[in-house]
Amino acid sequence: MYDVHFAGKATLSTNVNGVNMSVARRTQVIMAGMNAHAGGQAGPNAEPANEPGRARYHHGDLANALTRAGVALAREGGPDAVVLREAARQVGVSPAAAYRHFAGHDDLLYAVKLRAQQELADAMEARVKAATPEADPAFEALRRLTAVGFAYLHFALEEPGLFRTAFCHTEQPANEADDQVETENSEQGQPQGAGPDSTVPAVRDLRRYRAFEILSESLDLLVQLGLLRPERRANAELPAWAMVHGLATLLLDGPLDLGDKAAQNAMLQMCLDTIVNGLVN
């Protein structure tokens, strides 16, 4: 049995199989994930920033070189900084050569957006693996969920340009759209990451985000351990993601200025407590 309730002043107390998870123990689990982030490194697919005009490419690899240059531009200035002509200048080729690989600005931005999404997912996976696993499966499941949330927020704060680019609006290139339709047709009737009972098409489509899949896997683990009832599993990613993404947006572009990482972590812990308390029982 898994009971969650607030004790005292907004503190979470959890009972797993008769063992009380005290506020101190819960905080210890969350802090383990926070400490794993300290001194962390960029994800394995992180693109090195290039000096303007110094990026080069191997023969036959111009499309990737332009995408890497676009990632460097996005890292510094967000999606508005991703300009095909500037990427060509950094790589050292003519705009005409760049247009042989990308039809225009939107196509390059779409490719950079996918790379930014991958870097976010890499950061989340690295955060989950960095901390020492908890011996108790229930504590480990909660540690993984909180690690995912902390990694998401810290990526947003440390890589604001890439974070904004990862979720910017851009038209999908025609060839990518054709591939997507083919994939959708081949997946009809397949179990989906947002829960096989998901009735929200937009939520089902989010499974293409690796970051979304990582969150889904964390929630699936809660179900496997009996911490989250199966009937509450469908679409559970949506409120969890919305809360953490909303906090990241408020910290980056909104009126919420907490000043330092300790205050940011405290605010995120409050959000994660709310998510856990709303999901498990």
Stretches found by the model and what they are:
Residues 1-50, 209-213, 217-225, 249, ...:
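C-terminal peripheral helix-coil segments that are non-catalytic and often amphipathic
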Residues 2-5, 11-77, 84-86, 90, ...:
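Basic, helix-initiating cap at the start of DNA-binding domains
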Residues 60-71, 75, 80-81, 92, ...:
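An amphipathic alpha-helix adjacent to DNA-recognition modules
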Residues 94-96:
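Key DNA-contact positions within bacterial/archaeal DNA-binding proteins
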Residues 125-162, 186-194, 203, 208-209, ...:
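Hydrophobic alpha-helical connector segments
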Residues 139, 175-227, 234-239, 262, ...:
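Amphipathic alpha-helical packing segments from all-alpha helical-bundle domains
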Residues 157-198, 249-257:
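Amphipathic alpha-helical segments used for helix-helix packing
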